Amino acid sequence: VNTAKYLASLPPHTFRQSHAAFHFLLDYVPGWERAFGRGGLIQYQSFLPRESAEAAWTEMLKLSHQRGLPAYLGVTKRHRPDRFLLSHAVDGFSAALDFKVAGGNRLALSSMLQEFDRIVVAAGGRFYFAKNSETQPGATARFLGARTISQFKRLKRRCDPDGLLASNLYRRLFA
C-alpha cells in the first residue's frame, strides 16, 4: 500500500485529495473489511523511536513468522512527538499490522501481541490504545510511567468525579 501511494504521487501523477482520503485509504476500498473473512482481524500499532524502530520491527516480524501468524497488511508512517498527556507519538515511526483471526488462532495472536508489547517497551516505544486490543495494564504502566498515569487519574477524577465516563478501553488499561 505504501509503495503504491508513493508511486502514485510521483510526477506527473500528483493530485489533491482530502485529509480523510490520504490518511484512511482503506475506507475508500469497497468491501475491504471482508478481506479478512468471518473472524475479522486484530490490528496492532506500535510507535518506535527512529533509533530502535528497525531492530524492534525485525524482531516482531521474525516472531510473527516463527509463530505462523503473519501480518497480512502493514502500514508505516513517520511521526513527530506531541505534548498530549497520553501521547503515543514519538520522534520516529509507526507500524500498523493487521492479523487475520481464523481457525482458532485468537489466543495465539493475543499471546504474540503481548510479546510485541514487551519488544516495543524495551525499544522505548509506545502504543495506539484504540488499535491494540490485547495491550494489558502492565505494558501501559511501563511505557507511560507511574507519574503520567497518576496525573491522568487525577484529571479524570476532577473532570468526572462520579466516574460516569468510562469505556471498556479505560477499564482494561487504567481502572
Regions found by a protein language model. Give the residues of each.
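Noncatalytic alpha-helical scaffold of FAD-dependent oxidoreductases
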Residues: 1-175
